[in-house]
């Protein structure tokens, strides 16, 4: 069985296009050699030219030299670790902080067993999963913002 669509040469519109030399792209353009030999190298070379051009026109500036004898007042981790950092910073017992972080993957593993629904169903018709997802999202954003603030203002976000 062929995957190519056979042209209907009895179609007068197609015959008129073929007579004018316009019908060769009517059923698709072949990948070999058109895409692989002509289009892909142009895209690859264009991407390389853009990267090299941006590197030449806007080089990255070097930061201050490292001084091991002058540490900053508060060392912050990368932005994606802010919620975890906030949990470890706020919880008084560090072992409890690590235990709280293990609840996140455990909750994600238990979630499919809480709501036994079809995986193709509408997610808005799954109230438990949606409420847990929204709670986790807002908690992560709240903890991430709190990690950027001093510890005395981190839980209230400086609002109270």
Swiss-Prot record:
> Under the cellular component aspect of Gene Ontology, which terms does the record hold?
plasma membrane-derived thylakoid membrane
Q: Which domain of life is it from?
A: Bacteria
Single GO MF descriptor: ubiquinol-cytochrome-c reductase activity
Q: Which residues cross the membrane?
A: 36-56, 95-115, 128-148
What is the predominant subcellular site recorded for this chain?
membrane
Q: Which cysteines are joined by disulfide bonds?
A: none
Any single GO BP term: photosynthetic electron transport chain
List UniProt keywords, sorted A-Z.
Electron transport, Membrane, Photosynthesis, Thylakoid, Transmembrane, Transmembrane helix, Transport
SUPFAM superfamilies reported in the protein's UniProt record = a domain/subunit of cytochrome bc1 complex (Ubiquinol-cytochrome c reductase)
Task: Please state which protein family the record places this protein in.
Answer: Belongs to the cytochrome b family. PetD subfamily.
| Assembly | The 4 large subunits of the cytochrome b6-f complex are cytochrome b6, subunit IV (17 kDa polypeptide, PetD), cytochrome f and the Rieske protein, while the 4 small subunits are PetG, PetL, PetM and PetN. The complex functions as a dimer.
User: Cross-referenced HAMAP family, in alphabetical order?
Assistant: Cytb6_f_subIV
Q: PANTHER family, from UniProt?
A: CYTOCHROME B, CYTOCHROME B_B6 C-TERMINAL REGION PROFILE DOMAIN-CONTAINING PROTEIN
Q: Provide the function of this protein.
A: Component of the cytochrome b6-f complex, which mediates electron transfer between photosystem II (PSII) and photosystem I (PSI), cyclic electron flow around PSI, and state transitions.
Q: What is this protein called?
A: Cytochrome b6-f complex subunit 4
Q: Give the species.
A: Prochlorococcus marinus (strain MIT 9312)
């Amino acid at each position: 069985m062929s995957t190519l669509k056979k042209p209907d040469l009895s179609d007068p519109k197609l015959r008129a296009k073929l007579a004018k030399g316009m019908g060769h792209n009517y059923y698709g353009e072949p990948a070999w050699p058109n895409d692989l030999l002509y289009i892909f190298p142009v895209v690859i070379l264009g991407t390389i030219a853009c990267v090299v051009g941006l590197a030449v026109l806007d080089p990255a500036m070097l930061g201050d030299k490292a001084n091991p004898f002058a540490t900053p007042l508060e060392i912050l981790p990368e932005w994606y670790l802010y919620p975890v950092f906030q949990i470890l910073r706020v919880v008084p017992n560090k072992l409890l902080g690590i235990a709280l972080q293990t609840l996140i993957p455990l909750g994600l593993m238990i979630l499919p067993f809480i709501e036994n629904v079809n995986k193709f169903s509408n997610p808005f018709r799954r109230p438990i999963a949606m409420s847990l997802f929204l709670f986790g999202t807002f908690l992560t954003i709240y903890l991430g913002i709190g990690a950027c603030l001093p510890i005395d203002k981190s839980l209230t976000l400086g609002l109270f």
